[in-house]
């Protein structure tokens, strides 16, 4: 079993080997994940290599009228989805966002299988949170756009 400390190139290879579609942009260093970006309510989803490990971050656009409800529900969401860090991002002139982040420390090295497991678990949990938030009317639905 070979352990790797992944960089962006290795992640691209592992995603290719797993037939996971991803995209690059000139605005950030992340690998954009279309499978999550296509989920209703999702603004963006990216996989980053950070100094502490891998970060799979997804932003959901919160309806401003639901902000208080989402804020009150954060504790439950974080308990129900322990593999994610879930928090609200408020910026002065932008719509509030619910950020869902999965983190995998990799400085001791990981295998391709460990990465695949982290990726699959994080994508599934993220999709479940997005579906629940849509059901609770926390997010802008496609019909609202």
Annotated model-derived regions:
Residues 123-128:
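Long, contiguous binding/interaction regions
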Residues 129-133:
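Long, charge-dense
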Residues 25, 48-50, 89-91:
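Short beta-strand micro-motifs enriched in acidic
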Residues 55-97, 101:
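Short, internal acidic amphipathic alpha-helical interface segments
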Residues 106-118:
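A short acidic/glycine-rich loop-to-helix N-cap element
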Residues 1-44:
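Charge-rich, low-complexity N-terminal segments
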Residues 36-65:
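Long, continuous compositionally biased terminal/linker segments
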């Amino acid at each position: 079993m070979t352990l790797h400390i992944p960089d962006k190139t290795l992640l691209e290879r592992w995603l290719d080997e797993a037939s996971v579609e991803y995209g690059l942009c000139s605005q950030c260093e992340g690998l954009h994940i279309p499978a999550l970006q296509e989920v209703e309510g999702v603004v963006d989803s990216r996989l980053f290599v950070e100094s502490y490990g891998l970060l799979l971050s997804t932003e959901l656009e919160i309806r401003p009228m639901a902000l208080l409800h989402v804020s009150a529900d954060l504790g439950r969401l974080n308990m129900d989805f322990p593999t994610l860090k879930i928090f609200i991002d408020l910026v002065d002139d932008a719509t509030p966002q619910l950020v869902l982040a999965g983190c995998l420390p990799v400085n001791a090295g990981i295998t391709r299988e460990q990465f695949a497991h982290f990726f699959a678990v994080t994508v599934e949990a993220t999709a479940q949170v997005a579906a629940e938030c849509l059901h609770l009317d926390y997010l802008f639905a496609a019909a609202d756009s």
